[in-house]
Amino acid sequence: MIRKVIHQKLNASGDLHYLLFCEHPHVYTLGKSGEGSNLLISDEMLKRINATYYRINRGGDITYHGPGQIVVYPIFNLEAFGITLKEYIHKLEGIIILLLESYGIKATRLDGATGVWLDIGVKGRERKICAIGVRASRFVTMHGLAFNINTDLNYFSYINPCGFVDKGVTSMQVEMGKQIDMSIVKNKLERLFAAEFGFSYKK
């Protein structure tokens, strides 16, 4: 379905944009610039933990997707918004930072890396709560963000997330000490995307 929508977007001249939400089974994906050595387990172990592994054409290194994580695939025409890919990534990070702020979680960006982080500058405490890996073809965006809500963080122990060996990962559940209603988070994300990019959201 995602490939079909992208194909339609690449061949359309209108200003119609798509915002896709999903929750994946256990899977590791490696971006174009990634190192295969950042997957720390064998094929046999992948089967044992019921996970799969793919090399894909997004930016970034290795990351994990799985249950309890909201993955968002915005398929936007950046030319229609008049922004660059770098500005687009900045907007995605800003949306997550605002959402976390609404839950009382202070998050920020990390210079030289994409995604949303907590406790930057605090040695031994820096951790990522949202990974971002995107690319654009003829101004149309592909891939997106992976936001840890109630994610089983044990799956991150089998990789060097996004190539970092000195930083951790976290989730909203860990930070707040309770299970989070993912439907509420999704609805907040829909509203924040609409506000940030100035469009009305139609399901």
Spans of model-derived segments:
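N-terminal lobe of the biotin/lipoate ligase/transferase fold
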Residues: 1-126, 180
